Amino acid sequence: MKYLRSLMQQFVTACKNQAKLIQQFTLSLLYLFIIHIVALLFFFLFRLVLFTSIDYQFPPDIQNNFLMQATAFIKGLWFDNVIACYILLLPLVILWITALCNYHSKWVFRFISIFFILFYSLSFIISAANIPYFSYFFKTINSSIYNWFGYGATTAGMVLGETSFYFPIFLGLISILLLSGSVLRLSSYFYHLINSKSTSISPINRLCIFATGAVCIGLCLFGIRGRMGYNPIRVSQAYYCTDPFLNQLGVNPVFNLLTSTLDDNRKENRYLHLMPEQEAITNMQSILQRKGIEGISPIAREVKCAA
């Protein structure tokens, strides 16, 4: 009888330990999920600020159509989730592997915190910059901004000298500070919570964690792809009506900048090098019998008015 009671106690203890281990991984997933939701809320905030600050007059058939306008925010959530899943993938894989190894170190959570803060800070800077960019060019920020990098001092003077840019800059900085504080607090809280439930791991636990993690990673990859069709999500998926502002409002600026940069670097869109550039210039100067004008063009010529 004592042996049976001892066996039952060992079984109950083992079940509790296995439940704790599963709970550890569940807490890790909850930690990532909360950060994911917080980031989506910030992306929504940037879109709402753009919507309310833009000086745009809707057509009469759309001006009072709340459902039509709200659809842009739903589309925006779709695109925001794609970017958030890109950022989520690496931390998810890391916590999955550490859970399989039953390894929960402080440096892991510290690295994940820095990773989230770094990439979401960059995303928020782009989202904040998109507000004045859209106001001036009436299009979502794209790879054309790289053209301004060659004029650093001029660009900085334009940004800092324009008072209308101060609010987006302030919004971006506040968002970064709030997200950084939230991520650090969540990381510290869940690290201590997970380590308070430390226990050994069994093959069954590893199998459960492996299956759960694989499903979550699969869902994250699907979130990155954005749709079930043959092609992954594209900017054109945001277009749903005849209004140009609403069609562009749903596009995440980080997504648009990323995809436009990748498109620029495609083989068919690269700069053509049919022959050495200097050789081509020399040939054209010889054919046109021009020496060019320095600072203007290698084939420019001076035209003087007849007296």
Q: PLM ranges: what are they?
A:
Residues M1, M8, M68, M158, ...:
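Detector for methionine-enriched segments
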